[in-house]
Curated annotation (Swiss-Prot):
Tissue specificity as recorded in UniProt: Transcript strongly detected in leaf sheaths. Weakly or not expressed in leaf blades, roots and calli. Accumulation of transcript detected in shoot apex meristem, vascular tissues, young leaves, vascular bundles of leaf sheaths, and peripheral cylinder of the vascular bundles and fibers in the nodal region.
Domain of life assignment: Eukaryota
Biological function: Catalyzes xyloglucan endohydrolysis (XEH) and/or endotransglycosylation (XET). Cleaves and religates xyloglucan polymers, an essential constituent of the primary cell wall, and thereby participates in cell wall construction of growing tissues. May promote elongation of three internodes (II, III and IV) and may be involved in cell elongation processes.
SUPFAM superfamilies: Concanavalin A-like lectins/glucanases
Name of the protein in question: Xyloglucan endotransglycosylase/hydrolase protein 8
Organism of origin: Oryza sativa subsp. japonica (Rice)
Active site: E106, E110
Length: 290
């Protein structure tokens, strides 16, 4: 489910930040904008160097942040520790979006909470020119609430790669005759919100507010990306930082494609290219291509 729906909640909710120390928060404020209820976010430093951001969700508000810059291609990663216990109905996200319009582009990583003892679902999705419905969903091979794990999006002109702890789990390839996010600059977003209408068992399981507040922690944010703050888009290598060569032409090799196949075989819980009920007139064109 795209965050243009989610953020209609988050935007109304609005979020701001309480910093445990002004020094810890200063660098964060240089990179991100936040709005809203100040007591729903904390920016702290564990060791004087590492920033940790805690987002909170309760009945009154969700929380989130968005990058000041917009990007056209890049490598984006963050470490996250998800909501523990009964997290049913909650949605935690790390994603890129060009905005809320009908023709928007978006690249999603979302975590859909579940009842205690049941696994989280990691939802990946790609939107191009307003066309989404390209979800691959996975259970994880570890408990994402017990410790921090690294989630990464690599977005370049050839493909989009989703990684978990440096393990590729999905690649979405560009085809010249099909829509692909390549012209609209996107901002980075992170949110924690109430997705009861959708997130857990197709909305059958709602948030148990007796367990609030729900908290998710972010740290170790890293980006190597081409900054493009021109709404009209366009791309030039001059906008890209040092180190761009590590990802700008990156495609998965045979061994990495084997890792994707391993993830699909052992942990995939949903593949839009196998959902005939959803696509009775035929699957999207990319489903038929290798």
């Amino acid at each position: 489910m795209a965050k243009h729906l989610a953020l209609s909640v988050a935007a109304a909710v609005a979020v701001s930040w309480l910093a445990a120390s002004s020094a810890a928060a200063a660098g964060f404020y240089e990179k991100f904008d936040v709005v809203g209820a100040g007591d729903h976010v904390r920016v702290v430093s564990d060791d004087g160097k590492t920033q940790q951001v805690a987002l909170t969700l309760d009945r009154s508000s969700g929380s989130g942040f968005t990058s000041k810059d917009t990007y056209l291609f890049g490598e984006f990663s963050v470490q996250m520790k998800l909501v523990g216990g009964n997290s049913a109905g909650t949605v935690t996200s790390f994603y890129l979006s060009s905005g809320e319009g009908d023709g928007h582009d978006e690249i999603d990583i979302e975590f859909m909470g579940n009842l205690s003892g049941n696994p989280y679902v990691m939802n990946t999705n790609v939107w191009a020119n307003g066309d989404g419905k390209k979800e691959h969903q996975f259970y994880l091979w570890f408990d994402p609430t017990a410790d921090f794990h690294t989630y990464k999006i690599i977005w370049n002109p050839q493909n989009i790669i989703f990684q978990v702890d440096d393990v590729p789990v999905r690649t979405f390839k560009k085809y010249d005759d099909l829509a692909y996010p390549q012209s609209k600059p996107m901002r980075l977003h992170a949110t924690l919100w109430d997705g009861s209408y959708w997130a857990t068992r197709h909305g059958d399981v709602k948030i148990d507010w007796s367990g609030a507040p729900f908290v998710v922690s972010y740290r170790g944010y890293s980006t190597n990306a081409c900054v493009n703050n021109n709404p009209a888009g366009g791309w030039s290598s001059s906008w890209c930082p040092e180190g761009t060569s590590a990802w700008i032409h990156r495609e998965l090799d045979g061994a990495e494609l084997g890792t994707v196949a391993w993830a699909e075989r052992n942990y995939m819980s949903y593949n839009y290219c196998a959902d005939g009920w959803r696509f009775p007139q035929g699957f999207p064109a990319e489903c038929y291509r290798k």
